[in-house]
């Protein structure tokens, strides 16, 4: 029956709507009718739970959004027209998918961001369509609660709170946690917003990290091994998304506070010529808050392996003795092997330092006459010695110097030897000198004798007192034994070095008591003792420790140097003052060419504390000074290397000066970069001049020794004395020695003369000079000189040619008045020969004059005949023409002929006459006459333009 009744509803509604009268009554009728039709409200669930994925618009509801209406299937009244959401600015909307079924959908108006809001709660209601299409009286359902959760998407990577982390750890400790790093994630869900893991990206580091970001060390850290570690750490969220950027963790290793010196460098480079250079400009002492009351610092420069104990001048012993002002008469018992000093030829030698090494199997005999038999009651023995513990039998004597019987007997007259690390000097007087029990053996017991280091020994004898100086310090003998004098005999004595000669009491004379060690500069000076000043100079080191600005050391600082300045002791009670004092300690090497290499450096410290049972210990500073290689000088000798002199000049009292213009120049190569920075050309070397000393120059005779019966080299002793140089002269040449400047040696060489009072059989003599610095360490080039002797029949020709020889441009012409006068004097001939020459010359003058007259007439005719032809030709303008004539070639041309030769002969005759009569014409006029006579006519005019201007040329 209900469906039958419902079919009338539209009709009734139409009738009701269609009636136009009634006004309010009609409206009320419609409501009554609608109430009869739309009896029920829509129905929905009381609550909904929805999920929406962020960045999406679909909401999945549980249960689904469906509204029911009991008025169904009545049109409009039983249909669902809308779902309404109650709330402010909610990003959701509900739409009806099917009015009849009441199915709806909840969706987002715009993308949902979980990071802004994770969940939403709001009210929703369903509305039916009312009673008709134009009805607004819709019925609504009850309010249902909708709760929506936003589902997160892992769109953000973890980020660390700090871009970098820094921590400081103490070496030698294991930490549970050095520091903690922390990362965050901006995702909203626990799954994606939480950090699940941390990881160290840097490999091979002694660190680990846990899931909470705590970093710990896996092993004990050492400050000496590595001062600082830098590691990279990353983080992962629970979705395993890594951090966008790793963070840097810097771990500084702090050393355990150890007392010691800080801020010093192990290698210190020293450039030669740098003067006094600070060794530790920034050093300071760390005491770790120790209660220090006083401090003693010992700085030691170890140079035992440089030369003979330190960097000393390497000049020869003679040069050093001269340089230090030692008395003359010193005899070198270990000279460099040479023809004159051949007794050291068989010894082992280090040529660079002239150090002789004795291996216990060799000795050297000093020839008779080198050392006088009677040394007198005053004499001095000096030597450098390096000696270690005696090998083999300890009782064996090791002889340094020995004077014993050559044959028959085995008496030792005087000797110097080492026995059981004791230095012993034996001196036995003869009966003719003393006849009483006198001191004979002097013993010194010193640790340095067997320490395998170089030491300088001086034994001063003023009998019966004998004093030993070692490294400048004085030592008296700890034991002196007496003995009777030696009985007189006629047995010759043998002086030996490195062993003692055993001439008697054996089947065959031989060496005995061999020395094991090294010796250098072994000398003896009979008749005089050396002063303390000379001894100090001879053993002085040229390198050592120094203090810059002594006045600024500060109060309370005491310091002390040893004699060689290799050890410096400083004491003080204020650490700040001690620091400043040690910062001023420097190294100095005064040699221009020091020995390159390493010098060990040690700084030891002794600390006293305030009443503490245990005081801090400060480790030694172990460093070294590297002395760099000095610039190598190049010594060059230059000057005139060939000249002629007349024989008469060689016979004169002054002789011939050999090296009037010699120059000694020392240069070094300096590398310069090209001026253009962009160029790729190699660097060029530029020679720069430098000044330094020389220690000898040898003038050697080449081609046979000098014959002392007719020739010699001479040099005034005053020239040497005023320049503090010495010289030795022999038939092989002249040797100048002594430490002096290059200019001093130049001045001395300028005065070397050669004389030959029988030059008739000699054509030329050749000489060679070679100079040295530092005992041959640097040598010059070999400068060769040839001196030719002009005999009387060669003087005229040689004079004419000699003045045309042009010296090299870097040489200065040196004119010697004595040379010119000698040449003129040599031209004088005996009176009878002069008369004959005058007569001959007169005849030649007449013949030459006639010949010249005829030649001039012939030339004049020739000029007149050819003048017309020349006018038609192009004139040759030779006003600016310069013709250079080789002065070593012949001057005769095709147009000169015999007339010119005759003119020259006439000229020479006139010169001889002028010389014999004492005429003193100038050199310039003579040269012009010699070049210009005999040229006439056109050739004469042309010769005026081609004249050789030799007014400035030396003879």
Swiss-Prot record:
User: Where in the sequence does UniProt note compositional bias of the Acidic residues kind?
Assistant: 899-913, 920-929
Where does the UniProt entry place glycosylation sites? 56, 98, 342, 374, 716, 729
Q: Where are the transmembrane segments?
A: 832-852
- Alphabetically ordered keywords of this record: Calcium, Cell adhesion, Cell membrane, Cell projection, Endoplasmic reticulum, Glycoprotein, Golgi apparatus, Membrane, Postsynaptic cell membrane, Repeat, Signal, Synapse, Transmembrane, Transmembrane helix
State the SMART domains in the record: CA
Q: Does the keyword Transferase apply?
A: no
Superkingdom of this protein's organism: Eukaryota
Where do Basic and acidic residues bias regions lie?
888-898
* Any one GO MF annotation of this record: calcium ion binding
Compartments, as annotated in UniProt:
Postsynaptic cell membrane; Endoplasmic reticulum membrane; Golgi apparatus membrane; Cell projection, Dendrite
Xref: Gene3D superfamilies: 2.60.120.200, Cadherins
Q: Does the keyword Ribonucleoprotein apply?
A: no
Segments forming domain Cadherin: 44-160, 161-280
Expression (tissue specificity): Restricted to the brain.
Annotated region Disordered: the residues are 887-955
An example Pfam family from this entry, by short name, is CLSTN_C
- Gene Ontology CC: cell surface; dendrite; endoplasmic reticulum membrane; glutamatergic synapse; Golgi membrane; postsynaptic density membrane; postsynaptic membrane
Return the PANTHER family for the record. Answer: CALSYNTENIN, CALSYNTENIN-2
- Record comment regarding domains: Binds synaptic Ca(2+) with its cytoplasmic domain.
Tell me, what does this protein do in biology? Answer: Postsynaptic adhesion molecule that binds to presynaptic neurexins to mediate synapse formation, and which is involved in learning and memory. Promotes synapse development by acting as a cell adhesion molecule at the postsynaptic membrane, which associates with neurexin-alpha at the presynaptic membrane.
Similarity-based family: Belongs to the calsyntenin family.
Protein name according to UniProt: Calsyntenin-2
What species does this protein belong to? Homo sapiens
Gene this protein is translated from: CLSTN2
């Amino acid at each position: 029956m209900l469906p039958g009744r419902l079919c009338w509803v539209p009709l009734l509604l139409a009738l009701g709507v269609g009636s136009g009268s009634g006004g309010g009554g009609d409206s009320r009728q419609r409501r009554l009718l609608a109430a009869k039709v739309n009896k029920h409200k829509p129905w929905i669930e009381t609550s909904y739970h929805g999920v929406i994925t962020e960045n999406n618009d679909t909401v999945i509801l549980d249960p689904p959004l469906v509204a029911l209406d009991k008025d169904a299937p009545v049109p409009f009244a039983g249909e669902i027209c809308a779902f309404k959401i109650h709330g402010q600015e909610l990003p959701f909307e509900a739409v009806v998918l099917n009015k009849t079924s009441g199915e709806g959908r909840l969706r987002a108006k715009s993308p949902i961001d979980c990071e802004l809001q994770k969940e939403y709660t709001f009210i929703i209601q369903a509305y039916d369509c009312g009673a008709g299409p134009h009805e607004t009286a819709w019925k609504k359902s009850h309010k249902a609660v909708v709760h929506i959760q936003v589902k997160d998407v892992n769109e953000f990577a973890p980020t660390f709170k700090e871009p970098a982390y820094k921590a400081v750890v103490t070496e030698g400790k294991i930490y549970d946690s050095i520091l903690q790093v922390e990362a965050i994630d901006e995702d909203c869900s626990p799954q994606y917003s939480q950090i699940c893991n941390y990881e160290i990206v840097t490999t091979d580091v002694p660190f680990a990290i846990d899931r909470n970001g705590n970093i710990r060390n896996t092993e004990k850290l050492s400050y000496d091994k590595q001062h600082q570690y830098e590691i990279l750490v990353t983080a992962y969220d629970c979705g395993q998304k890594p951090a966008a950027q790793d963070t840097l963790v810097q771990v500084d290793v702090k050393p355990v506070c150890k007392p010691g010196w800080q801020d010093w460098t192990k290698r210190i480079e020293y450039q030669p010529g740098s003067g006094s250079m600070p060794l530790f400009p920034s050093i300071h002492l760390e005491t770790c808050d120790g209660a220090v009351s006083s401090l003693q610092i010992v700085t030691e420069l170890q140079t035992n392996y440089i030369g003979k104990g330190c960097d000393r001048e390497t000049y020869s012993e003679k040069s050093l003795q001269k340089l230090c002002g030692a008395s003359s008469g010193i005899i070198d018992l270990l000279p460099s092997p040479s023809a004159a000093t051949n007794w050291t030829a068989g010894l082992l030698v280090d040529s660079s330092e002239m150090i002789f090494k004795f291996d216990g199997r060799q000795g050297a005999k000093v020839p008779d006459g080198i050392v006088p038999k009677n040394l007198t009651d005053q004499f001095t023995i000096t030597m450098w010695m390096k000696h270690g513990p005696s090998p083999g039998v300890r009782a064996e004597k090791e002889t340094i110097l020995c004077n014993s019987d050559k044959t028959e007997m085995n008496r030792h007259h005087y000797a110097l030897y080492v026995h059981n690390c004791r230095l012993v000097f034996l001196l036995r007087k003869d009966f003719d000198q003393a006849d009483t029990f006198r001191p004979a053996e002097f013993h010194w017991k010193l640790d340095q004798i067997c320490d395998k280091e170089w030491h300088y020994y001086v034994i001063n004898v003023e009998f019966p007192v004998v004093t030993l100086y070692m490294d400048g310090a004085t030592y008296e003998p700890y034991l002196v034994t007496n003995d009777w004098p030696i009985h007189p005999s006629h047995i010759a004595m043998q002086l030996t070095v490195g062993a003692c000669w055993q001439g008697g009491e054996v089947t065959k004379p031989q060496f005995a008591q061999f020395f094991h060690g090294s010796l250098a500069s072994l000398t003896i000076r009979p008749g005089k003792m050396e002063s303390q000043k000379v001894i100090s100079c001879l053993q002085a080191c040229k390198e050592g420790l120094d203090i810059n600005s002594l006045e600024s050391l500060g109060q309370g600082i005491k310091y002390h140097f040893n004699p060689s300045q290799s050890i410096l002791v400083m004491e003080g009670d204020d650490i700040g003052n001690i620091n400043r004092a040690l910062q001023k300690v420097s190294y100095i090497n005064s040699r221009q060419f020091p020995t390159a290499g390493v010098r060990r450096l040690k700084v030891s410290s002794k600390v006293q504390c305030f009443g503490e049972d245990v005081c801090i210990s400060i480790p030694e500073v172990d460093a070294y000074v590297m002395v760099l290689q000095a610039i190598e000088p190049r010594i060059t000798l230059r000057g005139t290397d060939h000249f002629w002199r007349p024989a008469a000049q060689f016979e004169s009292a002054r002789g011939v000066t050999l090296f009037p213009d010699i120059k000694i120049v020392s240069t070094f190569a300096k590398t310069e970069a090209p001026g253009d920075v962009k160029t790729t050309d190699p660097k060029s070397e530029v020679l720069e001049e430098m000044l330094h000393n020389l220690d000898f120059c040898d003038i050697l005779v080449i081609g046979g020794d000098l014959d002392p019966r007719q020739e010699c080299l001479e040099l005034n002793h005053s020239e040497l004395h005023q320049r503090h140089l010495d010289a030795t002269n022999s038939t092989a040449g002249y040797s100048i020695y002594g430490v002096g400047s290059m200019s001093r040696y130049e001045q001395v060489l300028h005065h070397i003369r050669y004389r030959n009072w029988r030059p008739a059989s000699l054509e030329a003599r050749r000489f060679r000079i070679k100079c040295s610095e530092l005992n041959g360490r640097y040598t010059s080039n070999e400068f060769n000189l040839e001196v030719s002797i002009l005999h009387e029949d060669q003087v005229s020709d040689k004079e004419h040619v000699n003045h045309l020889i042009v010296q090299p441009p870097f040489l200065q012409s040196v004119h010697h008045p004595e040379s010119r006068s000698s040449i003129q004097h040599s031209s004088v001939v005996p009176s009878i020969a002069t008369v004959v020459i005058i007569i001959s010359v007169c005849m030649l003058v007449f013949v030459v004059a006639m010949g010249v007259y005829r030649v001039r007439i012939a030339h004049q005719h020739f000029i007149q005949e050819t003048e017309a032809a020349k006018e038609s030709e192009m004139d040759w303008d030779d006003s600016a023409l310069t013709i250079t004539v080789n002065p070593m070639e012949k001057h005769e041309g095709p147009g000169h002929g015999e007339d010119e030769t005759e003119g020259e002969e006439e000229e020479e005759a006139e010169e001889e006459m002028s010389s014999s009569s004492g005429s003193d014409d100038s050199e310039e006029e003579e040269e012009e006459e010699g070049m210009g006579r005999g040229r006439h006519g056109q050739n004469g005019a042309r010769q005026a333009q081609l004249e050789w201007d030799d007014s400035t040329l030396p003879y």
